[in-house]
Amino acid sequence: MARGPKKHLKRLNAPKAWMLDKLGGVYAPRPSTGPHKLRECLPLVIFLRNRLKYALTGNEVLKIVKQRLIKVDGKVRTDPTYPAGFMDVVSIEKTNELFRLIYDVKGRFTIHRITPEEAKYKLCKVKRVATGPKNVPYLVTHDGRTIRYPDPLIKVNDSIQLDIATTKIMDFIKFESGNLCMITGGRNLGRVGTIVSRERHPGSFDIVHIKDSTGHTFATRLNNVFIIGKGTKAYISLPRGKGIRLTIAEERDKRIAAKVAAQ
């Protein structure tokens, strides 16, 4: 009989987005409890050691974070297994580096460097809108934030632009056709496109049809769609590839063309 929370995570059971090698040991770092789900986060130890190569071992990561050098969304984090997740801004003041955790078209967390201007805000998806005690309206975002007295026009599935320093809502983007979105789950993870239509299925999952800038169309569940811009203008900078996934044939043609150009 299980007693209490699990404390370990086997390497083979770790999310594929972490890109851990199969033979690098038995275990993977189990993320602490926090604002993002275990399968949708990237622990700081993997970000600093495996991605940025700032440390060789977990012990070195511990020494880095205990010096209070790493900030996530403007707050110092000293837990090496702190779960940073989609849209979080990771800042390292000692090296003047700013990153936003975002998916590439292969569905992996990519190292996406951003400008100091862009690091002042983040986008949050609205998960719930409700009324609390004394009829105070509030909303809950995808990263576990509760914001009181939001604009009454903000509804579930919309995105808000949040000022990280003040945690105030700067702007919001409605979930509607023609707006730019990124896919945060499923087989189309990391793709970017504009919403074409939404199929309602009461009692089941609503399906959203999306078209990317090359004209490819695909469909996904509503809860995998994260609005990132009005019209075709994105509120955040996108990683290399701009969220456009090429087919295998298109990737091959691109490689051949690059090889010919290099000769």
Curated annotation (Swiss-Prot):
Any one Pfam family match given in the protein's UniProt record, by short name: RS4NT
Domain S4 RNA-binding residues, every copy: 42-104
Biological processes, Gene Ontology terms: translation
Keyword Ribosomal protein: yes
SUPFAM superfamilies with a match to the protein in the record: Alpha-L RNA-binding motif
One MF annotation (Gene Ontology) recorded for this entry: rRNA binding
GO cellular component: cytosolic small ribosomal subunit
Keyword Magnesium in annotation: no
Keywords of the record: Ribonucleoprotein, Ribosomal protein, RNA-binding, rRNA-binding
Similarity annotation: Belongs to the eukaryotic ribosomal protein eS4 family.
HAMAP family in the record: Ribosomal_eS4
Name under which the protein is recorded: Small ribosomal subunit protein eS4
Organism: Bombyx mori (Silk moth)
